[in-house]
Amino acid sequence: MKYVTPDLCDAYPQLVSVVEPMFQNFGAKSSFGGEIVTVKCFEDNSVVKQQVDQPGHGKVMVVDGGGSKRAALLGDMLAEKAAANGWEGIIIYGCIRDVDVIRQTDLGVQALGTHPMKTDKRGIGDLNADITFGGVTFKPGHYVYADNNGVIVSPEPLSMPQEQ
């Protein structure tokens, strides 16, 4: 489904919280949304790697990488695995790499930027805890919507308004 965040903001002003503008769109899906699954990790993408192996239909992984720009939390292999397992998208408060392949992958991907270095794999990270960045708290089970206009969060699923 295609989401237009300005239209969602207009239709549901009391429900949505808008994330501060900071993300770039990298995936082949420029618009995506779904139920939030959270990962909190810092320069270690072990939990991200575990999660992309899980079924992700109707879900968006939101990764709090602490805003680090010293290593990439997502690369082409993990992005392709996430797409194959049905994830709608991944939003990373951190960096990604392999952007030329990710741009061709059927997945929504937003991140702060790119970095060619991979992370260490120390097995450190938290799954499905509340995380906060960009002035918004992301709660597992709530919903996130993203497009080229920005990222918004809602405690319940939103439908695109009908054109008048």
Curated annotation (Swiss-Prot):
Q: What is its EC number?
A: 4.1.3.17, 4.1.1.112
Any single biological process term in GO: regulation of RNA metabolic process
Q: Where does substrate bind?
A: G75, D76, M77, L78, R97
UniProt keywords, alphabetically: Lyase, Metal-binding
Q: Supply the enzyme class, top level.
A: lyase
Name under which the protein is recorded? Putative 4-hydroxy-4-methyl-2-oxoglutarate aldolase
Which residues does the annotation say bind a divalent metal cation?
D98
What is the native source organism of this protein? Hahella chejuensis (strain KCTC 2396)
The record's comment on cofactor binding reads: Divalent metal cation.
